[in-house]
A protein has these predicted regions:
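Short, intrinsically disordered low-complexity segments
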Residues: 71-97
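Polyanion-binding interface signature
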Residues: 1-80
């Protein structure tokens, strides 16, 4: 699931909840769900700038997103950047899983979007 804000060129910066392979998600045996913000511009410098803007304001978002939020290189693609967290091997039989993912994604949007 992806959520975009702003002009079409801003689509390279978005919020996303996605399944990622265990090989790139630390602590997972089968897979993980990644939730958060992504900067996926073709130029690494643009991604670094997007992340730098958020890192400059980390004192404002860290208390709300917590220590699980990682600001750094994108999982599986070093030129992209992220502020996101992973949930290793979530229980797919949990009837609240989709709701919990959606709520957490909205928390990232609510906290980070005003700072971008």
């Amino acid at each position: 699931m992806k959520v975009w804000y702003g002009a079409p060129e801003a689509a390279r910066e978005h919020y996303e909840a996605q399944v990622v392979d265990a090989e790139i998600a630390g602590g997972a045996r089968a897979f993980a769900v990644e939730i958060g913000f992504h900067a996926e511009h073709p130029k690494e410098s643009e991604n670094a700038a997007a992340l730098a803007r958020l890192c400059e304001r980390e004192a404002r978002w860290r208390p709300e997103l917590g220590e699980d939020a990682v600001a750094g290189a994108f999982l599986g693609r070093g030129s992209w950047r992220r502020v996101s967290e992973t949930w290793p091997d979530p229980d797919l039989d949990d009837p609240d899983l989709a709701f919990d993912i959606g709520v957490r994604l909205v928390e990232y949007i609510r906290v980070l979007e005003p700072l971008r």
